[in-house]
């Protein structure tokens, strides 16, 4: 279970979820009809090696991401999610935004793989071990950012707004924010603090996009925890539910709407249909998670 002030690197706790997601993006890129192509996700997997690389080579048939149920749908999910947020950033820069803030940046490679207008600055916030890993892997392969990229080594439970300002963020200029795959790892109070921080630093003309997930019913979450603990103890599964804060928060679209933003939430399953990917059936392992997931974007008029 999580504890206040807990820490991690790229292969442990919350950090390892970034590798898991990068592996899914790499598998999506191998499809003949990918929704999004992240050419650098594979580099991260191979840098760590082991099962992270084996699954890309087809040498890990029992890996979760290779399963017909969870694996197939999770890879589709990552392709769709990446496509959604890539399109969000294109709209933001077309509207004139030249400051981008990536919260809990993890192995996000958009600074390296998307086209950015001249004068764009991307601020990436995460724990120092995670930022170091990404920079060293990509730098070791000669990959350079396509615009100015500034690393801010900070825990989002600390005073990240001040750290962002100290790194040159201009609160008087429009900005585009992203919280992708982050909120489920925050307690409710920290999510409120995060949204408040974004709102306080974002001037008129700014944009924000988040992945929002409603909590599971308490009894269902407790059952998932018990099942997962047994599987982890047997060596057959990585922790996931043990990393979550299953706490009730205001839906992101509601929160930002109530604070003067124009927000639109798109249920994940609706977006999957829109981009031509199957929605998990009622008996699927991921059905409950997908049904509670919403992709939201908002502008501050």
Curated annotation (Swiss-Prot):
Gene3D superfamilies: Vaccinia Virus protein VP39. Pfam families: LCM (PF04072). The keyword Lipoprotein does not apply. One of its GO terms (biological process) is methylation. Keywords: Methyltransferase, S-adenosyl-L-methionine, Transferase. Exhibits S-adenosyl-L-methionine-dependent methyltransferase activity. Belongs to the UPF0677 family. This is Putative S-adenosyl-L-methionine-dependent methyltransferase MMAR_0539.
């Amino acid at each position: 279970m999580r504890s206040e002030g807990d820490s991690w690197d790229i292969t442990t706790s919350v950090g390892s979820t970034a590798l898991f997601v990068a592996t899914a993006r790499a598998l999506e890129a191998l499809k003949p009809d990918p929704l999004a192509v992240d050419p650098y996700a594979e580099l991260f997997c191979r840098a760590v090696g082991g099962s992270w690389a084996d699954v890309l080579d087809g040498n890990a048939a029992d890996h979760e991401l290779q399963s017909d149920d969870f694996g197939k749908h999770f890879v589709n999910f990552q392709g769709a999610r990446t496509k959604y947020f890539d399109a969000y950033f294109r709209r933001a820069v077309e509207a004139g935004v030249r400051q981008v803030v990536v919260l809990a940046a993890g192995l996000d490679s958009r600074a390296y793989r998307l086209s950015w207008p001249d004068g764009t600055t991307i601020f990436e916030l995460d724990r120092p071990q995670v930022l170091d890993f990404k920079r060293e892997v990509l730098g070791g392969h000669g990959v350079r950012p396509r615009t100015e990229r500034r690393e801010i080594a900070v825990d989002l439970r600390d005073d990240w707004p001040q750290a962002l300002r100290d790194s040159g963020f201009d609160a008087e200029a429009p900005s585009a924010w992203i919280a992708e795959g982050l909120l489920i790892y925050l307690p409710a109070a920290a999510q409120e603090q995060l949204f408040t921080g974004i709102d306080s630093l974002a001037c008129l003309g700014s944009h924000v996009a988040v992945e929002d997930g409603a909590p599971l019913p308490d009894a269902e979450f407790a059952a998932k925890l018990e099942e997962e603990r047994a599987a982890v103890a047997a060596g057959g599964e990585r922790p996931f539910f043990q990393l979550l804060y299953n706490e009730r928060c205001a839906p992101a679209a509601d929160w930002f709407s109530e604070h003067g933003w124009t927000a639109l939430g798109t249920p994940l399953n609706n977006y999957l249909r829109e981009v031509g990917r199957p929605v998990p059936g009622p008996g699927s392992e991921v059905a409950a998670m997908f049904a509670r997931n919403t992709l939201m974007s908002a502008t501050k008029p």
